[in-house]
UniProtKB/Swiss-Prot annotation:
Record's keyword terms, sorted: Cell cycle, Cell division, Cytoplasm, DNA-binding, Growth regulation, Metal-binding, Mitosis, Nucleus, Repeat, Repressor, Transcription, Transcription regulation, Transferase, Ubl conjugation pathway, Zinc, Zinc-finger
GO terms under biological process: cell division; negative regulation of transcription by RNA polymerase II; protein ubiquitination; regulation of cytokine production; regulation of immune system process
Region (Required for ubiquitin ligase activity): 20-63
Gene for this chain: e4f1
The species this protein was found in: Danio rerio
Protein name: Transcription factor E4F1
Function: May function as a transcriptional repressor. May also function as a ubiquitin ligase. Functions in cell survival and proliferation through control of the cell cycle.
Length: 719
């Protein structure tokens, strides 16, 4: 069907009655000239001018005419089928013994039977399908493409062959386009730039997602970074011409080409990006045979470097020419950190300051500092920079520094006041989607993070890290006002509010302010409700003429009645004087603020609950609330500690008061009541179980409930 004539390919069209099949068969030959083929009409041109004129003309259309001559790749027989006549074409192709179909799928070639005796001598054949729109259809995934070249490239994605290998990290890819996109990660080339904010991206898809994001790109943070990239010595064969600098800076840009002893050329590039880019940056183009070197120079990075005083020494040591280097000595203001590209790990470097990277097993790279393993050398380089404190990306809002631009981008979400992400379980809103995923673990019963020192387990990794500090007694967060240390930064923030008096959380019912959001929630969930106008009690004798100053140390309520109540208020508790049970005027003049509650049990219980709720809501972090009962023949001891609130209740109310306090701190309930017998008396300790992050600690046969707000409750029933 196909005849070979010297070094040219002849095409014969085989038409059947049932289908239109174009079968093109070519043989190998010596190609003396370059052939330019049109992707639409598949026409070939030997002259470049004729090919360009053909592309500019509008007469070029994709044809489905079976008479059109198509010249495929060398040694490949191509059969183009129409999707409408696919069934009839298959029958014709099977009947013809000289045709041989090849179908590419996952790297395997399925060949039909051939009547030819010498199967190896006949060229292979690839079947392309055309749909009604004139697009080529993939047999495996049914995707359509404009040209056969694009379809042929697409077929490599269904194969296991990875013939395109990165020269820097030896990662293999199926297509050349994937390799080019991968190399941009090494060179940091970002050719796709947003016209609104000036932010650049490595891939066009990333730019498209950026333009379609929920938040419009009105203001984007630009980063100031300093980089040094090392490439092989053979990669640079031309002199490097830097871009012209800005005239107002009075600096001469220099790209220093340094010849090292390890056959490595060092290129120092300093990138300085302004807040608002008024003019587009001019990229410096360098003719270089090496693709990596050309990508580095043509990546759009502004080569705005300052000359160093060592430029003269570099010029003397290296035979390479340095263009634009000044003769005068200047100083560099940026700290240069060298990033080395180690191609052969077995070779030992002469510099003793650089530690040797040890490859482990199947291309795993181990960090010499912390024994962590990485799949690629590039990840290891970024990780090692964190050990040496190299953090070139700086937040302009809080001045924090980060190792990579991606981490800085995630950090910038914390400065956004809008909370766009909402938890579907509890309705809590967050600024970042990652915070929602971390929060969702609180609604599950899984505790995957176990402590290696004890048997405790936690739902989040951060909670486990905070718990580890309890074993090491590590409190890295120190208050600048009182030098008190905390294990969590959030605890320090809440503590500082007590110094500053800040109460950002307001109650919508009574208008009271709270320093913490959790305290406001507990205030709203209190059993007695929100008492905004509670000034006195209906069933308590209260003197309206009595004035109590903020310097009063305590107020004591004593009675011989076994149901009497003793309440000791600390002087550091704010606004508690209005809830002190008043005494007669003549007793107050003697300095003894004592009142006796002589009423029925129900009225006294109601009053105690109100007082307890007010005490807990107005007490701040660092207080210790002790609940104990008082008998008729017992004289209660009054603590002189300024951080203690003692509430002595009758035996019948101790358990109820303890439960109220537990609810005030966190949704706690009384679980068990255990009795511990001693020589003379028996003590009953009320054990409470509270919500998460509130620990129950046993201290001297008593239970202390410790909450994140640094408030401790000690409940003891004395029988």
């Amino acid at each position: 069907m196909t005849e070979e004539n010297n070094n040219t390919a002849a095409t014969v069209t085989d038409q059947t009655e049932h289908s239109n099949i174009i079968t093109i068969q070519t043989t190998l030959g010596d190609e003396d000239e370059d052939i330019h083929k049109c992707g639409k009409c598949l026409a070939e041109f030997s002259a470049l001018d004729a090919f360009i004129q053909h592309k500019l003309s509008r007469s070029c259309k994709r044809t489905q005419d079976p008479q059109t001559n198509v010249v495929p790749n060398e040694g490949v027989s191509v059969e183009v089928r129409s999707s409408e006549n696919e069934c009839s074409s298959d029958e014709t192709a099977t009947a013809n013994g000289e045709k041989q179909d090849a179908k590419v799928a996952s790297g395997d070639k399925k060949r039909s039977r051939s009547t030819s005796e010498d199967e190896s001598s006949s060229p292979s054949k690839v079947v392309w399908k055309l749909n009604t729109e004139g697009r080529y259809v993939c047999d495996i995934c049914a995707k359509t493409f404009k040209t056969t070249n694009i379809l042929r490239t697409h077929m490599f994605t269904h194969s296991d062959q990875k013939n395109f290998v990165c020269e820097m990290c030896e990662t293999a890819f199926r297509t050349k386009g994937s390799l080019i996109r991968h190399k941009r990660r090494h060179t940091d080339e970002r050719p796709y730039r947003c016209n609104q904010c000036g932010l650049a991206f490595r891939e066009s898809g990333a730019l498209t997602r950026h333009l379609k994001s929920l938040t419009p790109c009105t203001e984007k943070i630009r980063y100031s970074q300093c980089k040094e990239i090392l490439v092989s010595k053979d990669g640079i064969r031309k002199e490097v011409q830097p871009s012209s600098p800005e005239p107002e800076k009075e600096q001469i840009p220099v790209v220093r080409v340094v010849e090292a002893g390890q056959e490595i050329i060092q290129i120092e590039v300093v990138e300085e990006v302004q807040q608002v880019a008024s003019q587009p940056q001019t990229a410096t183009v360098v003719e270089a045979d090496n693709l990596i070197c050309q990508a580095i120079i043509n990546s759009g990075i502004a080569l705005e470097t300052e000359a160093t005083e060592a430029a003269g020494q570099v010029e003397a040591q290296s035979p390479k020419a340095v263009l634009g280097a000044p003769e005068t000595e200047t100083r560099i203001t940026e700290i240069q950190v060298t990033e080395e590209c180690v191609e052969t790990l077995a070779e030992e470097t002469q510099d003793s300051s650089v530690k040797e990277v040890e490859p482990v097993q199947s291309k795993l790279y181990k960090c010499p500092h912390c024994e962590r393993m990485f799949k690629t050398l590039n990840y290891l380089r970024v990780h090692v920079k964190g050990h040496v404190g190299y953090k070139p990306f700086k937040c302009l809002t809080c001045q924090k520094e980060f190792l990579t631009g991606y981490v800085l981008k995630k950090h910038m979400e914390t400065h956004v006041s809008e909370r766009r992400y909402k938890c579907g379980e509890c309705g809590k809103q967050f600024k970042a989607i990652g915070h929602v995923r971390e929060h969702m673990r609180a609604h599950s019963d899984e505790r995957p993070y176990h402590c290696s020192f004890c048997d405790k387990s936690y739902k989040t990794k951060n909670a486990l890290q905070v718990h580890h500090r309890t074993h090491a007694d590590d409190k890295p967060y120190v208050c600048q006002h009182c030098s008190r240390g905390f294990r969590e930064k959030s605890a320090l923030v809440r503590h500082i509010r007590h110094h500053t008096g800040e109460k950002p959380f307001k109650c919508s019912k009574c208008g009271r302010g709270f320093a913490e959001h959790g305290t406001l929630n507990r205030h709203l969930r209190a059993k007695g409700g929100c008492f905004a106008q509670l000034k006195d009690c209906e069933h308590v004798v209260n003197s309206e003429e009595q004035e109590v100053t903020t310097e009063s140390v305590s107020t004591t309520i004593v009675s011989d009645d076994p149901h009497a109540v003793l309440v000791e208020f600390s002087s550091v508790v704010a606004d508690t004087q209005e809830y002190i049970i008043g005494a007669p005027a003549e007793e107050a003049a003697q300095g003894e603020e004592v009142a006796i509650i002589q009423d029925n049990q129900q009225q006294m219980d109601s009053h105690i609950m109100k007082v307890v709720q007010q005490i807990v809501s107005q007490s701040h972090g660092g207080h210790q609330i002790i609940v104990r009962n008082v008998t008729a023949d017992e004289t209660p001891g009054i603590s002189d500690s300024g951080d203690t609130i003692t509430i002595a209740t009758p035996e019948s109310l101790t358990e109820q008061v303890a439960m109220t306090l537990a609810n005030a701190i966190s949704d706690g309930t009384i679980l068990t009541t255990t009795t511990e017998d001693t020589d003379e008396t028996s003590h009953t300790t009320v054990t409470m179980v509270t919500a998460e992050n509130v620990e129950t600690i046993e201290q001297e046969e008593q239970y202390v409930i410790a909450s994140p707000e640094e408030v401790e409750i000690q409940t003891v029933v004395v029988v």
